[in-house]
């Protein structure tokens, strides 16, 4: 019996060892699920890795790898491949996978520029149900779906996202929050309603108020920011100031005591250079006053047509256009104010400084490199010019340390801390037109442009701005010479409100439906061009002679009740317009620089007198006056976001590259008169 008992005890003692060996042996043959770490964001790889893992896995693990591959493909810009893989997802998913699928569907919509579809999908997601890394993606999707348009929802999304980010991403988040706040008008800000417990949002809105009150006074702004940081020490923006406000705190005004003015004074461009010089010197000696941005105006008595100066390629145009392309040098409708001016949003003026030393350098007489060397030796504190595009390109290559207000802009803008770019550009005018037309509630614009590089540039600028504002496809139609237009009128063909889509620079893949995200193709050109009734706005870039044919041809083909509002650039405006022309243009809206729209009547009279009533040169004169204002506020334009000057060529603001943008006045022909556009 003893041996038997011993055997049983021995067997009992060995059993756990055997079981453990079997368990460990089983573990050795089972590969752990690595997809969880990637799903939770603790590990990352590219789409090729995820696709390989997907092929080698099965069941839930395979689905996880498939979801990860879709996420990576979207991030890599391979939207079409992501959609194809998305459509292969099985219907049966667990809760975690289902939430990831919905989030991915929204991210794909964003990649396809289907912002409304993305917002619909995001509305179905409860952020609290998501993992932390998914929450960061969710809020980023909400931010992207807003398209940068400032709103209370965008601010809340940015605030919710901030705690989920690393240090580098936090600065980007804070800068984006400030961008949204500073993009609002004061009227928009006044309509915001927040909850009592939204302390962070309240702090941001108080900072916005400091900015509204002091943005044109850098010293007051500095003090206001410092006080705000003391009052809201726990606000993310107080701990890490927006980059733009850091620049404000470091603000130092630029000196204009010694100015170098670089202009062509000989050759074909001399007439423009000397006119800008006249305007600049007049402002220096007399000073400037804020201009009324929008006024009611009516045409004065008709004047005799003035000869136009010879156009010169490369003058005051950012894309090698002639001056006519740049300034629309046909005379503008002569106008006088007939109603009270609107309140200025930025009462900024540049005082006279007759004692300031001004030296003119002729860029047509010697290489720019030599001129810049001489300017530096002469001790200039700021350079205004050059005017010609090729000279601006040379300026950038020189890497000059001087502060420069260039009177043109290069093909490819370079952000230099000491350079701002101020040009009268048809592209700027097109972008302003897109904003104006969008503000009037239009949804489907057609751009009528000349068959030229000018037309292509204007169309592209308009379409880019339109889509930036959240608009959809922009159509374009090109016209030929005046003789071709005349033949069209005689033949009774007219102009149909149809066109081909302007090809965006950023290509997008086809969309997905909201309810069942599956691949769909984008509409064809025929689907766009055959829907003539869709067009509700037509932006026309034409000379007075061309538009005199174009507008009747539109009515000839579509009838006077087509429902489309017609808009035109200042290229079509003319001071010699008689009553017949004004009646023919009934209802047409057109853009014009504020000075020639009646916003500064004394200066308009002064400018026209100086240039013998030549409206094209009057625009260049106004450019010279505004150049003086910009030179006197160079540091503010360069460093203070939102700083604005109501100038004679437009309401002037600077983008982050210090390209000066111009908001123009909009006028309308009404019963033979010129009035503000409604």
UniProtKB/Swiss-Prot annotation:
Signal peptide segment: 1-26
Principal subcellular localisation of the protein: membrane
Keywords recorded for this protein, A-Z: Cell outer membrane, Cell shape, Lipoprotein, Membrane, Palmitate, Peptidoglycan synthesis, Signal
Low complexity bias: start-end ranges: 513-529
Function in brief: Regulator of peptidoglycan synthesis that is essential for the function of penicillin-binding protein 1A (PBP1a).
Record family assignment: Belongs to the LpoA family.
Record protein name field: Penicillin-binding protein activator LpoA
Encoding gene per record: lpoA
């Amino acid at each position: 019996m003893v041996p038997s008992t011993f055997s049983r005890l021995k067997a009992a003692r060995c059993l756990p060892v055997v079981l453990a060996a079997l368990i460990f042996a089983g573990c050795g043959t089972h590969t752990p699920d690595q997809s969880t770490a990637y799903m939770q964001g603790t590990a990352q790889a590219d789409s090729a890795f995820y696709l390989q893992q997907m092929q080698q896995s099965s069941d839930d693990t395979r689905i996880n790898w498939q979801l990860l591959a879709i996420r990576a493909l979207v991030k890599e810009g391979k939207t079409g491949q992501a959609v194809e893989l998305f459509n292969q997802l099985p219907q049966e998913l667990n809760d975690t996978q289902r939430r990831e699928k919905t989030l991915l569907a929204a991210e794909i919509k964003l990649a396809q520029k289907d912002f409304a579809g993305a917002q619909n999908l995001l509305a179905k997601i409860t952020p609290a149900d998501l993992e932390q890394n998914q929450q960061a993606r969710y809020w980023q999707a909400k931010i992207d779906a807003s398209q940068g348009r400032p709103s209370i929802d965008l601010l809340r999304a940015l605030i919710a996202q901030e705690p989920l980010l690393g240090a580098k991403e936090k600065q980007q988040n804070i800068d984006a929050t400030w961008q949204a706040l500073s993009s609002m008008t004061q009227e928009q800000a006044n309509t915001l309603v927040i909850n009592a417990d939204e302390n962070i949002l309240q702090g941001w809105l108080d900072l916005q108020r400091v900015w509204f009150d002091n943005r044109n006074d850098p010293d007051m702004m500095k003090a206001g920011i410092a006080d705000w940081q003391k009052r809201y020490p726990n606000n993310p923006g107080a701990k890490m100031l927006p980059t733009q406000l850091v620049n404000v705190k470091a603000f130092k005004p630029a000196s204009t005591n010694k100015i170098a003015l670089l202009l062509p004074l000989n050759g074909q461009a001399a007439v423009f250079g000397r006119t800008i010089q006249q305007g600049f010197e007049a402002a220096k000696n007399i000073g400037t006053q804020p201009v009324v941005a929008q006024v009611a105006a009516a045409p004065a008595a008709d004047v005799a047509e003035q000869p136009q100066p010879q156009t010169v390629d490369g003058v005051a145009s950012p894309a090698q256009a002639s001056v006519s392309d740049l300034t629309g040098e046909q005379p503008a409708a002569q106008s006088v104010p007939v109603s009270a001016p609107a309140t200025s949003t930025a009462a900024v003026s540049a005082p006279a400084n007759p004692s300031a030393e001004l030296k003119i350098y002729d860029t047509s007489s010697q290489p720019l490199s030599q001129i810049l060397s001489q300017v530096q030796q002469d001790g200039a504190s700021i350079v205004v010019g050059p005017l010609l595009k090729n000279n601006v390109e040379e300026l950038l290559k020189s890497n000059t340390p001087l502060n420069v207000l260039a009177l043109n802009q290069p093909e490819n803008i370079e952000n230099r801390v000491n350079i701002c770019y101020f040009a009268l550009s048809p592209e700027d005018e097109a972008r302003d037109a897109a904003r104006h037309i969008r503000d009037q509630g239009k949804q489907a614009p057609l751009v009528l442009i000349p068959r030229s590089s000018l037309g292509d540039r204007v169309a592209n600028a308009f379409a880019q701005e339109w889509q930036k504002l959240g608009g959809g496809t922009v159509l374009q139609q090109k016209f030929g010479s005046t003789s071709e237009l005349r033949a069209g009128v005689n033949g009774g063909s007219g102009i149909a409100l149809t066109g081909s889509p302007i090809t965006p620079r950023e290509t997008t893949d086809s969309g997905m439906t909201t309810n069942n995200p599956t691949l769909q193709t984008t509409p064809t050109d025929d689907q766009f061009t055959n829907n003539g009734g869709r067009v509700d706005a037509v932006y026309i870039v034409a000379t007075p002679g061309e538009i005199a044919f174009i507008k009747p041809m539109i009515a000839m083909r579509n009838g006077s009740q087509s429902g489309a509002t017609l808009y035109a650039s200042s290229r079509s405006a003319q001071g010699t317009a008689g009553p017949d022309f004004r009646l023919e243009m009934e209802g047409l809206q057109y853009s014009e620089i504020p000075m020639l729209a009646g916003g500064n009547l004394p200066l308009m009279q002064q400018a026209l007198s100086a240039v013998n009533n030549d409206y094209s040169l009057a625009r260049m004169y106004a450019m010279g006056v505004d150049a003086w204002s910009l030179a006197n506020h160079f540091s503010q334009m360069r460093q203070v976001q939102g700083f604005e000057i109501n100038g004679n060529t437009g309401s002037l603001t600077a983008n982050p590259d210090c390209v000066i943008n111009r908001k123009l006045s909009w006028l309308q022909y009404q019963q033979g008169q010129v009035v503000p556009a409604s």
